[in-house]
């Protein structure tokens, strides 16, 4: 039987090449056979730096003054974000494909977190139409990898602008867009 033994490294894939290589080497020598990580960058006390890339064309809020002490003052409505949620940044997704492929070589499942509430760029508050486009695009790019699992959200109940019905609809979009029927999950926070 297969027993998933996983870890979470939310944005390891959006770090420097050196840190990505170090993470892969650590995983190679670990008991883990699954890792959870995000498509979107994460803004949190240990993730206050800017990521290597963004999923959309546009410009982010100026993060040069963000520290671990003031990171909570920045949210999805922060001034300065200017994204085109209909124009994906292919290099961002190509890089994630590279990371998924490297995990596959190690025999590690890539449990991809599609949404999360720790956001200063506005990705957690996109319109339903933009969310649908994002899900279809992500499924089209990543579903061909045999080691992909879908995690609809990390702490879905902390994303206040999405209802249970929204999550059900997002699940249906992935089901319809992923011809390989990869495993699917959603993670709660407070509920």
Annotate the PLM regions:
Residues 2-191:
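Active-site mouth of glycoside hydrolases
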């Amino acid at each position: 039987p297969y027993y998933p033994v996983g870890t979470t490294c939310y944005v390891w894939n959006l770090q420097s090449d050196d840190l990505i290589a170090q993470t892969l080497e650590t995983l190679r020598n670990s008991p883990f056979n699954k890792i959870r990580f995000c498509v979107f960058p994460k803004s949190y006390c240990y993730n206050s730096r800017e990521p290597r890339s963004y999923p959309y064309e546009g410009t982010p809020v100026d993060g040069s003054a963000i520290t671990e002490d003031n990171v909570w003052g920045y949210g999805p409505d922060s001034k300065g974000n200017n994204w085109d949620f209909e124009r994906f940044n292919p290099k961002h997704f190509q890089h994630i494909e590279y990371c998924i492929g490297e995990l596959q070589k190690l025999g590690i499942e890539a449990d991809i977190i599609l949404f999360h509430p720790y956001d200063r760029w506005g990705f957690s508050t996109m319109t339903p139409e933009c969310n649908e486009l994002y899900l279809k695009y992500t499924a089209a790019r990543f579903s061909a990898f045999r080691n992909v699992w879908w995690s609809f959200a990390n702490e879905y109940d902390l994303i206040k602008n999405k209802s249970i019905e929204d999550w059900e609809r997002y699940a249906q979009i992935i089901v319809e867009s992923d011809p390989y029927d990869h495993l699917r999950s959603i993670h709660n926070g407070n509920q």
